[in-house]
Amino acid sequence: MPNFTDVTEFTLLGLTCRQELQVLFFVVFLAVYMITLLGNIGMIILISISPQLQSPMYFFLSHLSFADVCFSSNVTPKMLENLLSETKTISYVGCLVQCYFFIAVVHVEVYILAVMAFDRYMAGCNPLLYGSKMSRTVCVRLISVPYVYGFSVSLICTLWTYGLYFCGNFEINHFYCADPPLIQIACGRVHIKEITMIVIAGINFTYSLSVVLISYTLIVVAVLRMRSADGRRKAFSTCGSHLTAVSMFYGTPIFMYLRRPTEESVEQGKMVAVFYTTVIPMLNPMIYSLRNKDVKEAVNKAITKTYVRQ
């Protein structure tokens, strides 16, 4: 029986086998990817050059945008290539690398969202101490935790994936390499890997989501005690955008990973993964900027400076 090291490449079955839809999908997802890059890289640049955006909230937001760029870029280019290719293959090494970065960036993002919730708690519940407690040094330390932890956990998970055995079926029923479809085509004793995947995902999503929920529960209590209606409105507006992003980001991976990888669940997971890997990274810059007065002012100032220089 061949083991995982005997595999040289996998075939990605993708979203559809209908040739007439593949060109349409290519155009749509290419447009989505371009908008994702433009929006998130634009957000990073805007935050770095705008004096009014030099606060912890926007510092963390720039890292969320960076994670979104990494997340989308890990999946979309290969998906676009396979939509126009007849072979639709991915190398063994490429599959492991894609698995590694996918798991890593997912964990980075969920904990960045938790850090952002904690930051909003500090700003809303401890406004007088916010400047001293959330110094630049503290922010750097807080944001380093998701990166170190995410890439460390991903290394362990990917090494476990490396130990899977395959018995001649090298077709992955997905448009990128991920644990659920790989487990589905693996043979031998895969139940330990299944349980490990569910436990790791469950622990991390539960812990990070608990930080978010506790932070926002305390924020709501603090906001309701405010006497100023404008203050309450501003606080809820700022928190609303973050809660929207949290709801979208946590909901889809929970649906994908906290189930046994059956054929039906993998098919459903593909549809969810399209939203998760392409649409959410595109929407995040819009969610955080459309109702944000500071971001709008920064954009207007940046545009004005550009025209003045010309």
From Swiss-Prot:
CDD domains: 7tmA_OR5M-like
Subcellular location: Cell membrane
TM stretches of this protein: 24-44, 53-73, 98-118, 138-158, 195-215, 236-256, 270-290
Membrane topology, record value: Multi-pass membrane protein
Keywords (A to Z) from UniProt: Cell membrane, Disulfide bond, G-protein coupled receptor, Glycoprotein, Membrane, Olfaction, Receptor, Sensory transduction, Transducer, Transmembrane, Transmembrane helix
First-listed, main subcellular location of the protein, grouped into a coarse class: membrane
GO MF, one example: odorant binding
Family under the similarity heading: Belongs to the G-protein coupled receptor 1 family.
Record-given protein name: Olfactory receptor 5M9
